Amino acid sequence: MDKIKYRPIGMKAIRLLERRQYTFDVDVKATKTEVKRWIEGFFSVKVVGMNSHRPPKKKKRMGSVIGYPVRYKRMIVTLKVGDSIPLS
C-alpha cells in the first residue's frame, strides 16, 4: 500500500476515466501483480487489465546544480464493467 504514491489528475487521466481506466503513480520497484492485489483489496473492484510505463526524466535546476527528480512508474488500470473507484 505504501508503494502507491498518488493519482495524477491531468487531461489524459480524465479522458481515460470514460473507458474505466484509472491512473496511479507507483514506486519503481512495484510490480503489476502487487498493484493489482492492492487495488482489488482496497477498493473492492475487479481489475481486468493493466498497463505500465515510466515517464521520461525531466531536468531540475537548484541554483548551479542540475539534477533529476525521483523516478516513478505509472500504472493504467482497467476495471470490469460496472466497477468504479471514487475520485476523492
From Swiss-Prot:
Main location: plastid
UniProt-listed Gene3D superfamilies: 3.30.70.330
Assembly and interaction partners: Part of the 50S ribosomal subunit.
UniProt xrefs under HAMAP family: Ribosomal_uL23_B
Stored InterPro entries: Nucleotide-bd_a/b_plait_sf, Ribosomal_uL23-like, Ribosomal_uL23/eL15/eS24_sf
Family: Belongs to the universal ribosomal protein uL23 family.
Name of this protein: Large ribosomal subunit protein uL23c
Top-level lineage group: Eukaryota
Role description: Binds to 23S rRNA.
Pfam families from the UniProt entry: Ribosomal_L23
GO biological process: translation
